[in-house]
């Protein structure tokens, strides 16, 4: 299941109906807001997989987002809406599957989207433009939740919400042009993300 783009109700209903007819089948949720379906035979797994076509196909499309300000009373920004816009922009740009990492988005400082522990993260914020507050997100880079490699992301600045999809597309295009995947590119060019992000943080 894709955590970055809510599946339509038809998909969820079809999945529920299929699992109801499979003894011992279980759906388990993870801290990264993804789901695993367990206790399936090979044939059952193929049927369930066919029901989830159109969900997350890449690490980026499996990005994590809290429920966001459209639902949460505490959330200041629409993190789900931002992620859906980013996934749509990246799909339209037809970037290679490994050009962008899984990102984490929280609508506010409560950190429900664990923005500090993602390779890249965004936290809901505001930015003054011509003296008026505009929807924005604070950008974090370099977080890691892997055991033995734990790190909190560094705060790089505030980016207008409307500019984030374009930033991610440009970043993905830059990575793709290198012929490397995102992780290899970051190792080869440690300042690359900051360089691409700079105009969007201005």
Residue ranges of model-derived segments:
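Extended hydrophobic packing segments that form well-structured cores
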Residues: 154-202
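Small-residue-enriched alpha-helical segments and adjacent helix-cap loops
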Residues: 5-132
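Short Gly/Pro-enriched loop/turn and capping motifs at secondary-structure junctions
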Residues: 110, 144-147
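Intrinsic-disorder/low-complexity, polar/charged segments
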Residues: 41-42, 145, 192
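Conserved small/polar residues in nucleotide/adenosyl-binding loops
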Residues: 1-3
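Short beta-alpha connecting loops at secondary-structure transitions
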Residues: 67-71, 146-159
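Phenylalanine-focused residue identity feature
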Residues: 36, 60, 122, 137-140, ...
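Gly/Ser/Thr/Ala-enriched C-terminal appendages of enzymes
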Residues: 127-143
